[in-house]
Amino acid sequence: MKRNKLTVLIPPTPDNVNASEWWPVKSDVNWIETVYSDNKPAPSKLQGVDVFVGTDFTYEMAEFSDKLKAILIPAAGYERIIADALPNGTVVANASHHEAPIAEWVMMVAVALDHKLLQSHKTFITGLWDHWPGRYGPYRELFNRTFGIIGFGAIGRRVAKLAKAYDMEVIASGRSNNHSQIAQSLGVKYCWGKQGMKEVLSRSDFLLVATPLIPSTLNLIDEQALASMKKTSYLINPARGHIVNEYALYQALKEKKIAGAAIDTWYKYPTEETDQPRPSTYPFWELDNIIMTPHHSGATDGTRNRRAQTVAENIDRLTSGQPLINVIDF
């Protein structure tokens, strides 16, 4: 039986690339390209659309979604999809595939923090030998240290593999005991529940935040959690800014309650109205014990290609009546 051609709403493809090349579908689909503002199309553009490719969905968009079968997120996070706004029968699926570059970023900043790399570069290019051994140091090494991971999904597991390659002890925690077997296969001690998280916080030399932002993880790393960490430890967050309490983190770094941090995900982002905002209410940029990057740890060509492939596969699955992959259970 011949199926109707799907209408798919997408943002404009770059450099005049054909939509079917950017999103490599095998099916014959009707593409509608439109400019997104603050990650969203004009709500009226959803009218008559079967598939919406995007990261945000609002009540206003729902009002025009008369045919919407699926929202395909070309990213991992789904916190900007308002679940209560979804039309009946609309399926939401994401596309992660960013664990490899994020894990590389994590290990890069871990070494950089230990070796005071940014501070050393900043002073040395001005002609100062302030970080020369004998005048500063000694520096530290990853070997034989403890890497703690909060959240043992794809990113956490990838980081665990790399940390083990540095001969580090790796401990991880999650909300349930579901990951015990895979952790054991990777040589990782897995602790679950609140007690497990307490153990990871107190024992880690490096603490990776790798859990999704959902209601139960909002401000998960708060003042109490930061206070339970070693004063010599580092916090690394490529997940979502609001998992770590903004003020508590700033105070912990400013008062040297922890040794430092590397942060890739923030509390404020560019919008149509504010193109270059400061990423936080608090002046993290004035501190000397933080590495700040603009949410780019997973933004590689490989990630983009893998995500596009997953979105395309789900379009093909929807066309042929097969169940989608990576479906979000709200």
For the regions a language model picked out, list residue spans one by one.
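Rossmann-like dinucleotide-binding domain for NAD(H)/NADP(H)
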Residues: 232, 238-330
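Rossmann-like dinucleotide/phosphate-binding beta-alpha-beta segment
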Residues: 136-231
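Rossmann-fold NAD(P) dinucleotide-binding segment
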Residues: 58-65, 83, 216-235
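Short glycine-/small-residue-rich Rossmann-like dinucleotide-binding loops
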Residues: 57, 76, 211-213, 239-240, ...
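Oxidoreductase and adenylate-handling cofactor-binding alpha/beta cores
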Residues: 103-122, 164-168, 309-317, 322
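Phosphate/diphosphate ligand-binding glycine-rich loop within oxidoreductases
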Residues: 48-125, 139-140
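Structural alpha-helical scaffold elements that stabilize or flank donor/cofactor-binding regions
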Residues: 42-45, 61-64, 199-200, 225, ...
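N-terminal glycine-/charge-rich "phosphate-binding" loop or analogous flexible N-terminal tail
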Residues: 1-51, 171
